[in-house]
A protein has these predicted regions:
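Protein kinase glycine-rich loop
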Residues: 9-15
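ATP-binding glycine-rich loop module of kinase domains
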Residues: 17-42
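AlphaC helix of the eukaryotic protein kinase fold
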Residues: 38-52
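Short beta-strand micro-motifs within the conserved protein kinase catalytic domain, predominantly
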Residues: 60-72
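Conserved short submotifs of the Hanks-type protein kinase catalytic core
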Residues: 69-83
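AlphaC helix of the protein kinase catalytic domain
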Residues: 84-94
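Activation segment signature within eukaryotic-like protein kinase domains
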Residues: 102-103
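Protein kinase catalytic-loop region centered on the HRD/HxD motif
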Residues: 108-118
Length: 144
């Protein structure tokens, strides 16, 4: 299936609001979520604000397109790494400097979101990806 130039691949994750699919475009690998036309109309301002966020600690929104059936496709960067809730307790997080780097990254990401007028609403360790380089990236911005 192809939506707005994005080839839909395998399901990456299934959340409360539905699946996230892996997708590819000329810009590389990304994740795509679909929302109903009603949800899209309600969340369009949030997505527009999200495009203004420029922080390496917030997953980037690449595109928002309408599918042929009227649903909204939200395309965000794919962030390699593991959720913080999986990382907690691992040897990689034991050094104090590493923990500090993660907390500072979360704070910077939240500051960027709030600066754009976005309230996350569900900031949990499961919604923070720790990249292999130890950078914290806030995800799950799509919905309120």
């Amino acid at each position: 299936m192809n939506i707005g130039g994005y080839e839909i691949g395998q399901v990456f994750h299934v959340g409360a609001r539905g699946p996230l699919w892996r997708t590819r475009s000329s810009d590389g690998e990304a994740l795509l979520a679909l929302r109903s036309s009603d949800d899209g109309e309600r969340l369009l301002d949030r997505w527009k604000a999200w495009t203004s966020v420029s922080s390496r600690h917030v997953v980037a929104l690449r595109d928002v397109v309408r599918s042929d059936d009227g649903r909204w496709a939200i395309v965000q960067d794919f962030v390699p790494g593991r959720p913080l809730d999986v990382e907690i307790g691992s040897a990689d997080l034991r050094p104090k400097a590493t923990r500090r780097q993660i907390v500072e990254g979360i704070a910077a990401g939240m500051s960027a979101l709030h600066g754009a007028g976005i309230v996350h609403g569900d900031l949990t360790p499961a919604n923070i990806i720790v990249t292999p380089q130890g950078r914290a990236v806030i995800i799950d911005i799509i919905d309120e």
